[in-house]
Amino acid sequence: MPFQFGTQPRRFPVEGGDSSIELEPGLSSSAACNGKEMSPTRQLRRCPGSHCLTITDVPVTVYATTRKPPAQSSKEMHPK
C-alpha cells in the first residue's frame, strides 16, 4: 500500500505550557491548528501551515528589554 502524504496529522512534542487536549471527534487536524490553541497559562497561535507557534499578547516592553542595544562606534565612545 503506497504512502499518501497528509493522511495522518503530524505530531509535535509537547512543551511546557502547551495544551494536552486531544482533538475532539469529528474535528480535523487542520481545523484544530488554525486559529488559537487555549492553554491555562498562555495563549498560543499557530500559522496556517502549523509551522510556527507564537505566544500572543506579549507586552511590547518584553521585546524592548530583550533587544540588544546598537553597537557604539569608537567615535561615540571616545569623543575628542
Swiss-Prot record:
Superkingdom classification of source: Eukaryota
InterPro entries associated with the record: FAM229
Chain intervals for the UniProt region annotation (Disordered): 1-44
Family of the protein in this entry: Belongs to the FAM229 family.
Designated name of the protein: Protein FAM229B
